[in-house]
């Protein structure tokens, strides 16, 4: 029997030009992470530019603290290797500027790899997806010319 994953979704309209701010930062990680795309530094939660997402997270998950927040810009051929966010209670992806033809966020079933993926999240501007930090996920190679801009983050339970 295929296992289930608890995924919570919210909608938060991206504020004006937030995608430009992410793109302006460029690839601060120099493609050294699981994300083979342009990735900003890990600490955008400290920048008021991104207070719409941090405020939304704090309002909806008051028992958690955002420990890391970063932006990603995927171009044709970019992808993210399968990984999880071990050591964090929750992780999230916020689709800032995408189209439904952009590569999805996929949650495979590592216990039953012959089974269909557990969840395939089609990008939609403003969609915020929150999931357990231990859940395996990936993004297949981006196949079109529309830049896929997202913000991702990690949260820990307050102690």
Where are these regions (language model features)?
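Catalytic core of non-heme Fe(II) oxygenases with the double-stranded beta-helix
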Residues: 65-141, 146-150, 158
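Non-heme Fe(II)/2-oxoglutarate
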Residues: 1-63, 69-72, 79-80
């Amino acid at each position: 029997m295929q296992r289930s994953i608890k995924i919570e979704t919210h909608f938060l309209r991206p504020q004006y030009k937030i995608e430009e701010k992410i793109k302006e930062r460029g690839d601060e990680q120099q493609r050294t992470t699981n994300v083979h795309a342009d990735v900003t530094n890990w600490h955008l939660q400290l920048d008021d530019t991104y207070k719409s997402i941090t405020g939304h997270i704090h309002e909806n998950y008051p028992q958690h603290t955002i420990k890391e927040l970063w932006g990603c810009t995927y171009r044709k051929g970019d992808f993210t290797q399968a990984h999880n966010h071990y050591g964090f209670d929750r992780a999230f992806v916020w689709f800032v500027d995408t189209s439904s033809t952009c590569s999805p966020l996929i949650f495979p079933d590592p216990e039953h790899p012959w089974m269909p993926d557990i969840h395939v999240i089609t990008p939609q501007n403003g969609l915020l997806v929150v999931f357990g930090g231990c859940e395996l996920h990936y993004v297949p190679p981006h196949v079109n010319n529309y830049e896929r801009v997202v913000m991702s983050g990690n949260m820990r339970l307050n102690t």
